[in-house]
Structures are given as structure tokens and as C-alpha cells.
């Protein structure tokens, strides 16, 4: 939709209806000057993919995706890749049971310090390169019993890991 809109700085999508949208892939890909974006109201009920949705949005410090409905989602490959100013992300309320690809989710997110995720006992996830090029002093919050064992092994030893 806004693929490579490199001059885009701020956008308000409040009046657009996304109820029938099933793919948000590449929506803001390459919007390297985007500083302000509110996607908290997006209707993502039918979405199957958020692949590279925010790829290269290097000036975004925060992205509120905490209310995304992800029951039907299968792919979040590189969703926040190269969001080099992103400081924290809350995906704790996401339904991850159908997601099978989170590879390179945070690649190049060099300022990311706080991640909240929930894996809903998803045993089929691929974690290839999920934390590649992350700082060594971040924090990760997870809920007990949510299949985080594979992922926890990939976190840097210096990270603060908290179980809720």
C-alpha cells in the first residue's frame, strides 16, 4: 500500500476500512522516514500475513501492535526487520498458534530492548535468525508454558528474561 514511500513522515489511516484485508505484507516496507504511525485500530481479524509489514521503517521508535488479531495469521517473517529505532514491542496478546514463520522478525532492530511475546503452545514455529543483530542487554518477557524453550536458548545470556 505504501511500499517504498520514503518521503512519508506521518500518516493517519483512521477512516480506511481494512475489515476485508487478509494480507498486510509490505504495507509500510521501505518507509524509511516514517516517524509516527498509529496502527492500533487496524482490523486484522482476517489477516494471514504481516510479512515485512514495517521492514526498513528505521525512524519508528514505537509501533503499537498489541491489539492485532492474529488468530488466522501464518506468517510474520521480517515484520519489524531493520526498524533500527524501535525500542520495545508488545505482542503478548497475540494468538500465535497458527503462525509458522517468525524468521528474521527483529533482524537489524539494534535499539530493541524490551520484547513481550506469547507462543500459545505453538510447536511448529521456525526461529531462524529471529534475534540476529540485537543488542546484548535487552529484556524478554514470556508466559509460563508457552513453548519458549527453543527461543530462550537463542537469547543472549546478558538479557533479562522474565516469566509472567
Descriptions of predicted regions:
Residues 3-4, 26-30, 52-56, 78-82, ...:
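Short beta-strand elements of solenoid repeat domains
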Residues 6-21, 32-48, 58-74, 84-100, ...:
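Structural signature of tandem-repeat unit edges
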Residues 129-131, 147-161:
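Short, aromatic/basic amphipathic alpha-helical patches
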Residues 1, 22-23, 27, 49, ...:
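Small-residue (G/S/T/A) turn/hinge positions that recur once per unit in extracellular repeat modules
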Amino acid at each position: 500500500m505504501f511500499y517504498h514511500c520514503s518521503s512519508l513522515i506521518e500518516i493517519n489511516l483512521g477512516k480506511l476500512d481494512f475489515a476485508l484485508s487478509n494480507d498486510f505484507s509490505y504495507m509500510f516496507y521501505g518507509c524509511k522516514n516514517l516517524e509516527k504511525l498509529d496502527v492500533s485500530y487496524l482490523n486484522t481479524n482476517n489477516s494471514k500475513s504481516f510479512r515485512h509489514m514495517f521492514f526498513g521503517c528505521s525512524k519508528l521508535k514505537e509501533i503499537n501492535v498489541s491489539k492485532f488479531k492474529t488468530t488466522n495469521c501464518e506468517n510474520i517473517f521480517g515484520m519489524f526487520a531493520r526498524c533500527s529505532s524501535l525500542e520495545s514491542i508488545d505482542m503478548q496478546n497475540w494468538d500465535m498458534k497458527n503462525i509458522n514463520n517468525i524468521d528474521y522478525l527483529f533482524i537489524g532492530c539494534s535499539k530493541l530492548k524490551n520484547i513481550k511475546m506469547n507462543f500459545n503452545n505453538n510447536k511448529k514455529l521456525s526461529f531462524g535468525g529471529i534475534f540476529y543483530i540485537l543488542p546484548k542487554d535487552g529484556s524478554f518477557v514470556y508466559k509460563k508454558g508457552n513453548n519458549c524453550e527453543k527461543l530462550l536458548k537463542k537469547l543472549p545470556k546478558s538479557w533479562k528474561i522474565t516469566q509472567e
